[in-house]
Amino acid sequence: MKKTMMLMMAAVAGIAMADADVDALKAVLEKVTDPETQCRIGNCYAEGKVVAKDKAEALRWYRKAADQGCAEAQYRLGKWYTHYYVIGKKPEAAMWYRKAAEQGHVVAQHELGILYMRGAGGVTNNYAEAVRLFRKGAESGYARSIHNLGTCYMEGLGVPQDRAEAFRLYRKAAEMGFAASQYNVGLYYDKGWGVEKNKEEALKWYRKAADQGLPEAKDMLKLLESQQKK
């Protein structure tokens, strides 16, 4: 069974191998130098694909790939450090996200922006830098970045407060299917924030977000439907 798993792992990593003992298979994997392949091996250990989950091994392989400049591995290291998977290493989160972000990794740009919003992961609070990073993600069409940029305009964080621009961004992300933005668009129509009140539009957007399981959208949908029945 273990031999079969190792052969499957070699296949996942893109290595063609004939039958061999486990130690030989491990030895072949250890000789892998391609960073993209190293990252895929890390994914196997991180996600429990083919082999049992092993955080230490996942990190070891991600680090091998990240040290060679693999943006995906750098992003994954940042994610692990951010979510406390590595005790005492959280300050490294921003470092790894930044390395990936500088290579154009859109999700890493977004996550680094989150750290700047919170003043966490090895960086101090800097709303202007968060906005810059969210804007990069938004320009690449990443819905989460579009939504967060909208929130920055809504709250006046790092940019002058502009509810009209916030609505435009929320609407854009909502049309991409992002539930939190759908909910916010519903709120805009429900409350008349910079747009004409429109309960039907509010219901439509609340329902879209509720259909994706967003609790607050379910609550507002239920409330608005009950009000319309009176």
Which residues are covered by each model-predicted region?
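Positively charged n-region of N-terminal signal peptides that target proteins for export
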Residues: 1-4
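Hydrophobic h-region of N-terminal signal peptides that target proteins for export
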Residues: 10-17
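N-terminal segments that cap or nucleate solenoid repeat domains
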Residues: 18-49, 64
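Terminal, low-structured helical/coil segments at or just beyond the last alpha-helical repeat
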Residues: 21-24, 28, 208-230
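Short helix-capping/linker turns of helical repeat alpha-solenoids
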Residues: 30-35, 47-49, 67-70, 83-85, ...
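Hydrophobic face of amphipathic alpha-helices that form TPR/SEL1-like repeat modules
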Residues: 40-47, 76-83, 111-118, 123, ...
